Regions:
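A solvent-exposed, charged loop/short amphipathic helix patch at secondary-structure junctions
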Residues: 40-45, 167-185, 330-346
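Active-site-proximal loop/turn and secondary-structure-junction residues that shape catalytic pockets
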Residues: 27-29, 83-87, 124-128, 160, ...
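Noncatalytic carbohydrate-binding groove/subsite architecture in carbohydrate-active enzymes
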Residues: 96-246, 267
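A structural motif corresponding to the C-terminal end of an alpha-helix
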Residues: 10-20, 64-75, 106-118, 147-150, ...
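Aromatic/acidic polysaccharide-binding cleft in carbohydrate-active enzymes
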Residues: 212-338
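C-terminal beta-sandwich/jelly-roll accessory domains of carbohydrate-active enzymes
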Residues: 319-448
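Conserved, mostly hydrophobic/aromatic
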Residues: 14, 61, 79, 107, ...
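Aromatic-lined substrate-binding rim segments of carbohydrate-active enzymes
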Residues: 1-62, 66, 94-123, 186
Length: 448
């Protein structure tokens, strides 16, 4: 007897909100588990005791969702198997690599026999440049090519975390909770993306889509920079530098309210989320609210800026990214405290960005600026300015939430014929700023 009642509730919610799910077929139901006591984060991560029984479950699930949502809808979804199978058997990996390869092949065949048009991905692979984990996925794809089960798209987990440092004693656990050995390079994600593109070409995979299914600069739920303006600027920099090289970015995570670890009894404890456990947006949340307002026509980019267009309007994203110092990357906090977390940036000077936009049609324009920095849009910094004490009442939480909105300023500017629009902006350390240039009709224009 198969019951998918809980899944129905989740998928119904996804569908009614006009979203498309990516279904990862894991964890293992305990009644199918070969090793019932093998658990991670409270769920079973064992291989099945019977691959045929597993495939029967997958088949019944496909029948169920097809009957409920229709095959045409299902074909717009994505499906995948397992999570990070290239990690050790202390995590998601199988003790015997060949067991996983056959497990994947059987699941792939089950899904493609049901409907060849269903998109089936590479199992989300934890990518570490230069490590044996990288070789795993290359070997796996070669095996898939030989066994007629090549995935339809590539899927990766990536963190800017070094796994070779003695300080990160838990290499086999990838430092999920306490990883403190971070990349010293500000371009770690870009280097990873370029490496994957080269490997895709070497494997002869053409333009196979590449999805970043889990990404952050750290997997740690206790990295104090997660709450600060560093994270909002990190998100903007890395998405804009790589937007045309990947097919998706999946940020880890939406909220600090994660079940993987016990939650500290603090508001800002360095959690990965865009929201605190109380639902207060962090600066990182506003990075996405600004990014989504960019236009669909790319015009240009450079150091600290990105320009788009939508119809007759222009959008310019500015950012002043600085990377933390070598000592912090290797786990030394020194004078960093709960209420002073910016001491790890050697260069704290503001930066001035000057841009000239030519061929702007004559007319009157509204220039709107929305910005996130330590004074505006950062709930952590607002909490510090309120005294840095733990909040205890709904009134206090509400005050903080209302005080943490981004800054905003707008003005009108008239552009004469053949005039160049000159913009000059000074950005604080780790500030992000969206400038929107929109044509308006003024009374004087109408009278003409």
């Amino acid at each position: 007897v198969y019951s998918f009642s809980y899944l129905d509730k989740i998928l119904d919610f996804v569908i009614v909100n006009h979203l498309k799910p990516w279904l990862q077929l894991s964890y293992m139901p305990e009644k199918l588990a070969k090793y019932p006591n093998r658990r991670l984060f409270g769920a079973n991560v064992s291989q099945p005791h019977s691959v045929s029984a597993w495939c029967q479950l997958v088949h019944e699930f496909l029948l169920h969702i097809t009957d409920r949502y229709g095959l045409d809808t299902i074909k717009t979804w994505k499906f995948g198997l397992w999570n990070q199978p290239n990690t050790s058997s202390d995590l998601f990996g199988f003790t015997n690599e060949n067991d996983f390869f056959l497990f994947y092949k059987s699941t792939y065949d089950c899904i493609k026999d049901f409907c060849p048009d269903i998109e089936f991905s590479l199992p989300p692979t934890y990518y570490i440049v230069g490590e044996s984990y990288e070789n795993w996925y290359l070997n796996f794809l070669e095996w898939c090519k030989k066994n007629s089960c090549l995935p339809d798209c590539l899927s990766f987990t990536y963190y800017d975390t070094k796994m070779i440092s003695d300080k990160n004693h838990s290499k086999e656990s990838f430092g999920f909770v306490y990883a403190r050995s971070l990349s010293e390079s500000p371009d770690g994600l870009k280097d990873f993306v370029m490496q994957v593109l080269r490997e895709r070409r070497q494997l002869g995979l053409g333009n196979m889509p590449i999805y970043l299914s889990e990404w952050n600069n750290t997997p740690s739920q206790q990295d104090l920079l997660n709450d600060t303006c560093f994270k909002s600027c990190y998100i903007v920099k890395n998405i804009l530098e790589n937007y045309d090289r990947l097919d998706s970015f999946t940020y880890q995570a939406l909220t600090d309210l994660m079940a993987d670890d016990a939650l500290p009894n603090k508001l800002f404890f360095g959690g990965l989320g865009l929201f605190t456990v109380n639902g207060i947006p962090k600066a990182s949340y506003y990075a996405y609210t600004l990014l989504r307002q960019l236009g669909d026509q790319f015009l240009g980019r450079g150091d600290g800026y990105f320009i788009t267009r939508k119809h007759n309007s222009y959008q310019i994203m500015l950012y002043n990214y600085k990377h933390f110092n070598y000592l912090y990357a290797n786990g030394e906090r020194f004078d960093m405290t709960e209420t002073d977390r910016y001491t790890v940036f050697a260069d704290s000077d503001p930066v001035t960005i000057e841009l000239c936009l030519s061929n702007i049609p004559q007319g009157t324009y509204k220039i709107s600026e929305t910005y996130v920095n330590r004074t505006h849009g950062s709930s952590y910094d607002q909490w510090v300015s309120m005294g840095g004490l733990e909040l205890t009442t709904p009134y206090e939480f509400d005050l903080l939430k209302k005080a943490s909105s981004p800054g905003f300023h707008q003005k009108l500017m008239h552009i004469a014929s053949d005039e160049t629009l000159r913009l000059n902006a000074e950005l604080e350390l780790l500030e992000i700023r969206l400038i929107q240039i929109t044509p308006v009709i003024c009374p004087s224009d109408v009278s003409r």
